[in-house]
Amino acid sequence: MINPNPKRSDEPVFWGLFGAGGMWGAIIAPVIVLLVSIMLPLGLFPGDALSFERVLTFAQSFIGRVFLFLMIVLPLWCGLHRMHHAMHDLKIHVPAGKWVFYGLAAILTVVTAIGVITL
C-alpha cells in the first residue's frame, strides 16, 4: 500500500547547493585563480585593469557583492556536502552529521553575507 503522506526529504536542497557549488568551482573559480594568481603577477593585464581602486569599486557594487558571495558560499556548500558524504562512505558516523556539516555551511553562509554586506 502506498503511503498517502510520505516523509519529505530535504536532500534535494543540499544536492542543489552541492551541484551549484561544483559547477561554480569547475567553471568560474579556475578562471578567477588564473587571472589573479598567474596573469596578474606576470603583468599580462593591460595597465590598471585590476588596480586596487577598480577592484574595490567592483567589490562594493551590487554585482560585485553578489559575485563575492557566490564565490565563497557555493564552493563552501559543495565542499561540506562532499565531506558529509565522504564521512558516511568511510563509515565514520558523526553524531548528527547532517546538522554538523550543513549547520556549519549555513553559519558560514551567514558570516559571509554579513562580511560581504559590510564591505
From Swiss-Prot:
GO BP terms in the entry: fumarate metabolic process
Domain of life the protein comes from: Bacteria
Gene3D superfamilies: Fumarate reductase/succinate dehydrogenase, transmembrane subunit (1.20.1300.10)
One Pfam family matching this protein: Fumarate_red_D
Keywords: Cell inner membrane, Cell membrane, Membrane, Transmembrane, Transmembrane helix
Subcellular location: Cell inner membrane
Cited SUPFAM superfamilies: Fumarate reductase respiratory complex transmembrane subunits
Recorded GO CC terms: fumarate reductase complex; plasma membrane
Signal peptide boundaries: none
Transmembrane segments: 25-45, 61-81, 99-119
NCBIfam families cross-referenced by the UniProt entry: PRK05470.1-1
Subunit (UniProt): Part of an enzyme complex containing four subunits: a flavoprotein (FrdA), an iron-sulfur protein (FrdB), and two hydrophobic anchor proteins (FrdC and FrdD).
Family the entry assigns: Belongs to the FrdD family.
Role played: Two distinct, membrane-bound, FAD-containing enzymes are responsible for the catalysis of fumarate and succinate interconversion; fumarate reductase is used in anaerobic growth, and succinate dehydrogenase is used in aerobic growth. Anchors the catalytic components of the fumarate reductase complex to the cell inner membrane, binds quinones.
Protein name (record): Fumarate reductase subunit D
Organism: Salmonella choleraesuis (strain SC-B67)
